[in-house]
Amino acid sequence: ECLPEETNRRIVDVISDVNLCYSEHARRYLNASGVAKERTYVTGSPMAEVLHENLSEIESSDIHQRLHLQKGKYIDTEKNFLSLFSAVNAMAEKYDMPILYSCHPRSRKRLESSGFALDRRVIQHEPLGFHDYNCLQMNAYAVVSDSGTLPEESSFFTSVGHPFPAVCIRTSTERPEALDKGIFVLAGIDGKSLLQAVDTAVEMNRNEDDGLPVPNYTDENVSAKVVKLIQSYTGVVNKMVWRK
């Protein structure tokens, strides 16, 4: 409920004729909120299809050469919490490796206006394209992000043999099924918790204890299911909603 996009989600849930969910967790949430069971279906996440379709371009990206980064010797971070910049500096100090910060323009302005000095090992970079960003993720020492898609990306790359330590800077998640499988760590939003989470994720990755891919995140026929559900339900919606 504390996520800013939750208001939009709830509006869409109510006005949609059919709700297509990523998991049984999501379906139960919708049903508990009052959405009719006959209007909810589990299709899985489309992320695996998207990543698989683009995998060759992701793997052939030259982003490491362009940024002068050595694979497995940097930490990829994407965050918007000013209070955590000190933790980013602490990561640079502790691991003594480049911290690549994919920085949104608004975050850059906030950082500049605050006068906070980032460690010299922290590399600020404009938001990256899809191929470059995922190439960096799959080869990073660790990935620290507040993105809601991190669990899906971590699950997919684990399923294709490229697991990476995934740490999410949030106090809650709409992806509980990913926590069920241990595919990422929820770090909270304070510096101490973040460092502990990174340590945990990195150590478990070293021990090849990366968690298990979430089945709903590795399903590669999601688009086919969506098309068939829409086709199947169009007549029902026309009759029951639009009275055609």
PLM region spans:
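Short acidic-hydrophobic, aromatic-tinged amphipathic segments that line or gate anion-handling sites
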Residues: 21, 41-42, 123-127, 184-190
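A donor-sugar binding/catalytic signature common to diverse glycosyltransferases
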Residues: 19, 133-178
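Donor-nucleotide binding loops and adjacent catalytic segments primarily
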Residues: 59-139, 244
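A conserved, positively charged/aromatic
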Residues: 1-17, 137
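C-terminal amphipathic helix plus adjacent low-complexity
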Residues: 203-244
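A nucleotide-sugar donor-handling region in carbohydrate enzymes
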Residues: 12-79
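Helix N-cap/beta->alpha junction signal
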Residues: 23-25, 44, 104-105, 147, ...
